[in-house]
């Protein structure tokens, strides 16, 4: 999200001391979930999506199927600039809180749909189209989440601690990394490669729904930033 309202309200004030944990949680939990979803997709693209969504290419050359799978992964990066502009615009219009909730739901719903998506053998080329749409939605959600979370953290920060507060959302990325790879490693060692290829790869995507519910609970409890509230009053 953009911060056009920030300059007009430099004296908005610091957060109360007892609200600091809520600020940290609200700014970090969403980023952790968004990157968890993103890393789950990267793991699946590297390990499973080639044979599931591009079986003909994988049969001819496994590396070719994997390459096609990574092309769907790249769709997210093409969608991110659009997501930044979209959520930046509405972040200044309707508020940081609302747009962060929408960003989290966008990423969460699209990730959950990937976990339910039939492969090429069931839906044909339509499965690839839906996969790319979901991946684009993930990119849009991630773009709005990361920048918006940083804005929420810094706009709630005391004037002399904005850099410190701004670092909190970035801590969510490694948390998402360890959760995604840790869960996939646990499932692979427990279920085995055959079961993972058949259906186990879906579990991390479906588990995202639980994380999103937790994230939404945190987000819905937060209030608008003092800088945005002051800008609305003016």
Placement of each model-derived feature along the sequence:
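Extracellular/periplasmic helix-loop-helix junction of adjacent transmembrane segments
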Residues: 45-82, 100, 125, 129
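Cytosolic juxtamembrane N-terminal segment immediately preceding the first transmembrane helix
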Residues: 1-46, 62-65
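Glycine-rich segments within core transmembrane alpha-helices of 12-TM secondary carriers
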Residues: 161-188, 210-212
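Hydrophobic core of transmembrane alpha-helices in multi-pass small-molecule transporters
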Residues: 117, 122-143
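Symmetry-related core transmembrane helices of the 12-TM Major Facilitator Superfamily/SLC fold
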Residues: 198-217
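Central cavity-lining transmembrane alpha-helices of secondary-active solute carriers
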Residues: 70-89, 103-110, 175
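C-terminal ends and interior cores of transmembrane alpha-helices
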Residues: 55, 105-124
């Amino acid at each position: 999200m953009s911060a056009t309202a920030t300059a007009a309200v430099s004296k908005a004030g610091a957060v109360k001391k007892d609200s600091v944990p809520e600020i940290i949680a609200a700014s970090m939990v969403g980023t952790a979930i968004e990157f968890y979803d993103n890393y789950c997709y990267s793991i699946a693209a590297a390990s499973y999506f080639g044979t599931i969504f591009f079986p003909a290419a994988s049969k001819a050359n496994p590396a070719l199927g994997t390459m096609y799978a990574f092309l769907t992964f790249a769709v997210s990066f093409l969608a991110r600039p659009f997501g930044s502009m979209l959520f930046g615009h509405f972040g200044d219009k309707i508020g940081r809180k609302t747009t962060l909730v929408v960003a989290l739901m966008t990423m969460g719903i699209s990730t959950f749909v990937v976990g339910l998506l039939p492969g090429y053998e069931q839906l044909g080329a339509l499965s690839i189209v839906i996969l790319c749409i979901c991946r684009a939605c993930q990119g849009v959600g991630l773009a709005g989440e990361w920048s918006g979370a940083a804005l929420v953290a810094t706009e709630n920060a005391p004037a002399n601690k904005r850099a410190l507060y701004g670092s909190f959302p970035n801590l969510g990325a490694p948390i998402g990394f360890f959760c995604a790879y840790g869960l996939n490693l646990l499932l692979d060692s427990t279920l085995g490669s055959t079961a993972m290829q058949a259906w186990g790869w879906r579990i991390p995507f479906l588990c995202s729904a639980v994380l999103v519910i937790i994230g939404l609970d945190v987000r819905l409890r937060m209030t608008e930033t003092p800088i945005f509230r002051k800008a609305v009053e003016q």
